[in-house]
Amino acid sequence: QPDKGQVIYDGRDITSMSASQIKELRNEIGMLFQGSALFDSETVLGNVMFPLRMFTRDTYASCKKRAEFCLERVNLKGVNDLYPSEISGGMQKRVAIARAIALNPKYLFCDEPNSGLDPKTSILIDELLSDITHEYNITTIINTHDMNSVIGIGENIVFINKGHREWVGNRAKIFTSSNEALNDFVFATRLFKEVKGYMIEEYRKHESADE
């Protein structure tokens, strides 16, 4: 329990909730960890079934059916009986996504989802997260330092600097922001400096067309 203050979730103070209320609320939240956090001793199918068996009273057959559906949704076939060590890092991440959506959550929290992945796989994971977010009407919150992800799929963007909310906006506004700390972080590389100039030009064209 915190020493002071409140933690508000959907208008409710969770610090005053009972253990059973917290468990019920937990079913509304999916978690995608930085390192996938799969159980080495469980098969791919077993990993996705875990939250269903832990947090629901569904039958084994029902849990298995839901887990198989989630694995198909993340485009994984023929790996259900394999163990995490027998599949690639990108496939492990997709297993973790399948597990995160198994309980059909309202919210999906992702911690550095592209960590350790090659650029091509990172794009595939970004697209998968974006598709699932819109398909199932989930609010997805992604903590990332990967500006490719921010620019690629970010819709409502919050820039946290030294523990404080420094800036809030969308992808278009990133390229026209005068916030010095944001610019130093986003456009630290030569590539993004060049992209910034191009995007500002495109943004201005778009603004002119709307007038």
Question: How would you describe each model-predicted region?
Answer:
Residues 172-211:
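C-terminal boundary and immediately downstream tail of ABC-type ATPase nucleotide-binding domains
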Residues 108-111:
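Catalytic Walker B motif of ABC-type/P-loop ATPase nucleotide-binding domains
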Residues 102-106:
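A short, proline-enriched helix->beta-strand linker immediately N-terminal to the Walker B motif
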Residues 83-87, 91:
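Conserved ABC ATPase signature
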Residues 119-121:
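Helix N-cap at the start of a conserved alpha-helix in ABC-type nucleotide-binding domains
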Residues 5-13:
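Conserved ABC transporter NBD signature motif
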